[in-house]
Every structure is written in structure tokens, then in C-alpha cells.
Amino acid sequence: MKLLHLFTTASILLLMATCSKKDSPAPSPTPTLPGCASIISPVGGSFVTSTSVVLTWSGVTGASTYDVYLGTSSSPTTAIATAVNGTTYTHTIPSTPNITYYWYVIPKNTAGAATSCSATERTFTYIVINAPASLGYYVVGYFPSYRSLADVPDIKFRMTNVVVYSFYQVNASGSLVAPSSPVASLTAVATKAKSNNAKILLGINDGSGDGKTNFKNMASTQSGRTNFIKQVMNVVRSQQLHGVDVDWEFPSTSDGSDITFTSLIKELSDSLHRDAAYYLSCAVTAGKYAGGIRDAIRNEIFPVVDFFNIMAYDDFSTSTPYRHHSDYTLATVCLNYWLTTRDMPAAKAVLGLPGYGRPSGITQSNTVLSYRSILSQGGNSQLDSAVVSSGGFSNYTIYYNGQYTIKRKAKLAKDIAGGIMLWEKWQDAPDGNSLLKAACDTVGRSY
């Protein structure tokens, strides 16, 4: 009886053990340890201009969530977000500019295990891009490197609030070329401008024979634009200038340079306007004639340029007599086009004035005279034409702007635009017949 009991008990235990082995689930496999994510953006020492930064990375096989680390020193140890589903995370950074941030992502599997991924760290810098403060009514005067500073008294610098040193030239690769033998150096003109409370801008034009090929070639590639902007910023900073004037004559829709001009101006503006540090101006065509040249100035650059020097002159003819190259009517036509037709902000439209005269119906070679030279030959400061002799031509009529017309144009610009520009300072009369004096007196600018 005892033997039967023992046998029965053993059978039951064996059966229970057998059932237990069949009913127990197999152990779960260990989750795969995920690799590191590739940082997508922001990356590579890039700049961001918003305090709301979208951090983006690649998905990783075996990762169920991601922890995001960010800080202001390398290999940050503080996670700004944990268990993030997906591959983006928006983070708000402080509004203090010029701070560099370091960041990386740690993918985690379902068990919460991860690989150290700090080696994938990338950086970005928060910057502020804003235009510097407007100067109000602009009175811009160009000063060519081939003129003598001794011939232009301090008062002429006080009459202007912007002086443009003209010109450095650009070559096809984007390098800047300073004047080889300047009568007046950039440093000397900058010193005189600053001592008379004027901003000093570096004027840049094209070093090629046609005045546009080097700009066109440089701007056609990202490397060319980058090199150009780097060189521009080096000169602006080293010479302690207040900005840059771009004098590309002219980009055009006919060859696609309008597209690369737009890219160049936007990229240059971003560099100059960082921390609202420097001004950017552009010389633009008068706008009287329809076509690819005036259409090349796209409206999308209006917000990124501080002011436009509208070249409302040189509308001459070598075959038709009695034609003024820059009368009052041309000024109204130009401003109407840029302000009304094109919607250029009025405060940024600067009306160009000529400090020289041109003949009509004959060659322009050696017959163009400065305003001061016209007066020295008996021209009247209150009129717009005179009989002069020059370049082998005797007693021909030259057309210029006297004080009366300059006053009218200055008032027009005061009423509907943002200021005036004179090409160029040396050509003006040094005394009471000065065109700049007439303009300043008209608009109430003290000097």
C-alpha cells in the first residue's frame, strides 16, 4: 500500500514538472543596441537667426526613442529632451546673440540602453541680422581715389552724411583690388569723413573693361560670392568703415545675372547686417527705359538693402542736339518708376544728381566737364546750360544742373523719397555756388 502511494506521488510530480516546462514562455531576446544618429541640421558651424531652433537627425535602426543633449560647451551632459519619438525636436534658446551651441542625440532601444554618441556632436551659432539705423534724409557724396583731398574742404564732408570712397574693383574670382596709385587713399578719405561726422562706405565696381563681366563671373558661383564677401568684410573691419556700396553696371535678365546678383546682395546683406553693424547700398539704373537692366533689380532685395543710389543722369545723345542728360523731368520719371511702379520704399530711394555737364549731339569724349570747370568758363550757377570749349571743340553747349535745379530736385527727394546723392564731391564748386550747399540749405540740413 505504501509502495503504491509512493508510485502515485512520483507520477504526479513528474507530470507537474512536465507541464511546467511546456507552459513557461521562452526568455525575450536582448534588444539590439542602437548606433548613433547622423545630425542633419543645424550642423557644421551654421548660423541660426531664430530663437526657435528645429533640431533634426536621422532615424536609427533599433532605436525607439531619442535623448537630445545641448549646451554652450563641448560634450554637454544635460539632456534638453528625453524619450523623443521621431527625429525632430524644437528647442527655444535664449535671445543673447553670438552664442555657440553644441548638441548631439543619443538613440535608445526599448530597454533604455544606448551607445555613447557625444562624438557626433555638432555646433550652431545664434546671430541677429538687422539693418543699422536709418540716417534719415541721406546726402551721399562719392569721392574718387584719383581726386585730391586738399581740393575738397571739410565743410563739403559735413554737408554729406555718407561718403562713398570709389572705387575698389572686383575680379572674376571675387578678390578685391585696391586702386594702384590713388591720389587719395581709403584711409585718408575715411579719416576725413569720420572727423566730419559722415559715414564712410567702400564703393566697389567692376575691374573688367565692360564694367560688368567680373561681377557676373564672380557672382555665378557660390565660391566666388563667398570669397568676395569674405574680402569685403576684411576691408570693412580692418579699415573701420561703416559699410559698402555695390556699383555693378549692370546685371541683366538677358544673361541670368539678375539671379546671381540677387543671391550676392542677399548674402552680402546678411554679413553686413549681422548685429546691425554695417550699411549696404546699391547704385541702380535710372529706370527710365524698359528692359533687362532695370528688371534685374528685383523687389526681393528691397528689404535687405539700406538705400539705393538712383543714377538719374547720363540720359544723353551723341546725335540729337539740345538734349539735357539730367533735367528735372528725368528726376520725376525715375522716382515715379522706382517708387510707384516698383514699390521701392521711399525712405530707401536716393536721387542721384550730376556734378558735371554733358554736351548733346556730339561726342562725349573729352567734352564732359565738371560743374566747377563750367563755372570757370563763365557758366552761370543758376542756369542749366552754358557755352564752353574743350577736347578740341569750341563754343559748344553743355548741359548741367545749376543751383536752381538742384534745389528743386532736393525738395522733390525730401517730399517723396529718402535723399540725394552727388557724383562726385570734387566736381562741385568750392564756394557759395556749391550744389551741395544749395541742396542742404533747401532741405534744412545744417553743416
Short names for language-model regions:
Residues 80-86:
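Short beta-strand segments within Ig-like beta-sandwich modules, predominantly Fibronectin type-III
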Residues 109-128:
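Extracellular fibronectin type III
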Residues 140, 172-184, 230, 250-379:
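Substrate-binding surface in catalytic domains of secreted glycosidases
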Residues 127-236, 323-328:
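Glycan-recognition patch characteristic of GH18 chitinases/ENGases
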Residues 53-62:
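Conserved aromatic anchor
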Residues 94-114:
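Beta-strand-rich modules
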Residues 210, 346-416, 437-447:
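Glycan-binding loop/region signatures in secreted carbohydrate-active enzymes
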Residues 3, 13-45, 125-135:
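Bacterial Sec-dependent N-terminal signal peptides
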